[in-house]
């Protein structure tokens, strides 16, 4: 059930939450961990309970990785289409978890899947969000050669979100992979150009440039930290904030 907030005023009215497909695996090596789904549904429900409008984009890497097949000769476009279908599967699983928690949710796919999902329509998505329904955007942009990170930034701009929240396994952006380099240092704040100049692997170039060109703030945080998502929405300084340079 969408839980009521603790009285704090939410900093953001509408957010776009980007989850990687790998995040749904939990401790598994493949697929979807139901416990992770339920926990994420609970955290999203907390946001809905304090009046925050939530759009979701989920990757598909827990179900399909096209890189190995592409290296073996598979056509890139075919691989990307398979990846889009994986994101739809994750979106349906998340919708089910939300509905079991009594949170109204809808899946809107960029590729037509009549009888399975709604087709993406910006105006309808905005109406669902305004009605406090969670909208899960599936199938990326509907085009090959674009990542789900790019899709998340594109949808955030289209629905006029206040911020893109990218959930990862680490608590922000580092100078290097903190799992591999113990001396890696965390950034609390970056500009889009600093991310591009330093070649930091936050998102792909297209996604970062989309955010920069449309002045869409981006925060990278650790979804595995309990309460981190709610803290961000209340204005907390979790993870790393990426935005335009202050004048």
Curated annotation (Swiss-Prot):
Homohexamer. SUPFAM superfamilies: Carbamate kinase-like (SSF53633). It comes from Pseudomonas syringae pv. tomato (strain ATCC BAA-871 / DC3000). Catalyzes the reversible phosphorylation of UMP to UDP. It is found in: Cytoplasm. PANTHER family: URIDYLATE KINASE, URIDYLATE KINASE PUMPKIN, CHLOROPLASTIC. It holds the Pfam family AA_kinase. This is Uridylate kinase. Gene3D superfamilies: Acetylglutamate kinase-like.
